[in-house]
Amino acid sequence: AGGNEKLKSRPVVVGCGPAGLFCAYFLAEYGYQPVLLEQGAPVEERQKDVEEFWKTGVLKPDSNVQFGEGGAGTFSDGKLNTLIKDPVGRNRKVLEIFVENGAPKDILYVNKPHIGTDILRTVIRNMREKILVWGGEIHFHTQMTEVLFTENTRRIRGIVYEDLLKKEKEEIQTETLVLAPGHSARETFAMLFEKKVPMEAKSSVSYTHLTLPTIA
């Protein structure tokens, strides 16, 4: 409720592209110990699978140039761009976090910031390690299959996820869920539609400055 109520359970973030990764990063930094679920592979595994694809043409659906930790831009040339107008300095904060995790300092002041593919993968790995050090939890090859609601108030009470390697399902209790599934999320949107979760297309983005309290 606007940051005024103490969380009863750990927040869950679905998707480890830029939105999900940074969301989990901030939550972990402020002591909320998020659980981050990613359907694809960690960046090291992605790199091996991508190299194998270029050599053999064998494509792994959940681990490739477009899919996995870091999102679709991980194997781009590392150019940084945003079309979001940001009066409160969040774009600058993103660049600072990149630098803190291994990106070159010149991205803070050059007109067209550029990290480079190899460095970008290192940055993503370093961000992941910090999330873990700060008490977060990350599950790769894991797909959210259901959102659970309370019967009367229709408030989120948890999710069900499947370990895609073990083919096992588990339930997590949470009242805070952030969905950042990126592309190839048809099953997620279909499930939300069946659950009668209100959805709308993005129109414009406006920011309100929020200050998160540090958990003792």
Model-derived regions, located:
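Beta1/beta-strand and adjacent pyrophosphate-binding region of the FAD-binding site
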Residues: 7-16
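Flavin (primarily FAD) binding-site architecture
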Residues: 179, 184-194
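Conserved N-terminal/central alpha/beta ligand/cofactor-binding core
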Residues: 45, 51-137, 142-143
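Conserved small/polar residues in nucleotide/adenosyl-binding loops
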Residues: 208-214
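Glycine-rich FAD pyrophosphate-binding loop
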Residues: 32-50
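N-terminal Rossmann-fold NAD(P) dinucleotide-binding loop
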Residues: 20
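A conserved short coil-to-beta-strand element within the FAD-binding core of flavoproteins
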Residues: 140-153
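Short hydrophobic core segments
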Residues: 14, 172-182
